[in-house]
Amino acid sequence: DRLRSRGLGDVYKRQDKYPDYVSRPEGDDYYWLNPSRSEVRELIADGVVEIAENYDVDGIHIDDYFYPTTAESFDGQAYIEASADISLADWRLENCSEMVKSIYEAVKSVDDDIIFGISPQGNVDNNYSQMYADVEKWCAESGYLDYIAPQIYFGYNNDVCPFTQTLERWERMVTNKEIKLVCGLGVYKLDRENEFIRNDGIIASQIEDVLSDGNCSGFALYSYASLFTQGDRSGGRFERETQAIYSALN
């Protein structure tokens, strides 16, 4: 709550030389660092170095938070100052890619054995139209990440992103053999979406698909705790789900 009201945002806003390093989009409760500014990207990379140097970590992982809005006002002034010869959308894609690259380089500058990965939205199109995350570039070129773990939190019959087709799309994008694909699975949906509620064992089936596929290096569950702390515990349903997952792994 401090960061929402009087924290990071106010610290930057009080300094005239940081006019738009932190922005708060209209209707948003949060302050957001502006990735269009090189100083902001450096600040984030420095934070990663601090973690890697001072803590015994195996990796650095970031979630699907990139641009919080499509509104031009968020970084319009920086775009004007940049005199970019590309569209605002393409410029934002470049900003996020520069940020991701700087994090990767920061990690490797400390210890090349520390891995860096990202868990972007599973809906590929949303990454481009809403988040300005150039996931295809990161999956194809070296120097951005070691693994990608898209949030493929969809059932097989999802109207927009059915699981099998979405997984296949991600597999086609990961063309760099040095980058591992880890499939994110939405355990939290077991009591939130009809397909998961009406059909036992969907997560277990998805695990089997991923492990038998040959193009994925593994899977991640979001959130693992959901198997034990969430939802209606009557009827033994969650016990059946956990047993099905266990069976899929053995």
Feature names for model-found ranges:
Residues 6, 100-112, 168-177:
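Surface-exposed amphipathic alpha-helices with a cationic face
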Residues 9-10, 72-74, 231-234:
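Short aromatic-enriched loop/helix-cap "lid" or pocket-rim segments at secondary-structure transitions
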